[in-house]
């Protein structure tokens, strides 16, 4: 359902968009994002025989890493944002899971040992693939990209949601371009020998308030980028759009998590 408003098609533009995730408010709002489908992890683990080391790229506050920590001897959770890794470390301390939190870019990170599994969420879009994937090809046989943490279809209906996105993306200086966004979102696949792709549908209940909060964890709608007044107006309009579809303030969301897995390549394959 979430469709990026700004198509970051150059390295400098991708770096600028990725910098939004260093903001402390974005890190706080990230906790309101829905989870990925639980069945996805069960399926993924069956594709990976080893259980020694895993690496989660662009880990945020540990949405994927903390699940992997239940199954691997060591999980390295890597993110350039101090706010994200601090949030993850604090939550992980309560769970007492064996996650090593590393504040570093994927481009700069080095490891003397390999990994049984490397994972990434939407952070895969912002990486410099020419720098990162040759390292991944030397470290692991399996990379898994996990996406889809907003409902499909939108709870207010696709037509109303598209109109909302088109209007608001324009207001923050972007252009609604779902085709361009989809092309950008799959750019990393040239660096993978894909073994498979599987969609996991599930349902999730979320309050309207938390749904709106989760939007501000995204680069397009971060409060730092929008400014206080515009963000408040965005919240009011989105609340008015969603509230008629809620029961007792709760939305019943139909979700789809998508898993794409395969072998990382040291150079892009011809497409």
Where do the PLM segments sit?
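Class I SAM-dependent methyltransferase SAM/SAH-binding core
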Residues: 55, 61-108
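A short, conserved alpha-helix within the catalytic core of class I
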Residues: 127-135
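Conserved class I S-adenosyl-L-methionine
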Residues: 2-49
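Conserved acidic residues
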Residues: 52, 73, 116
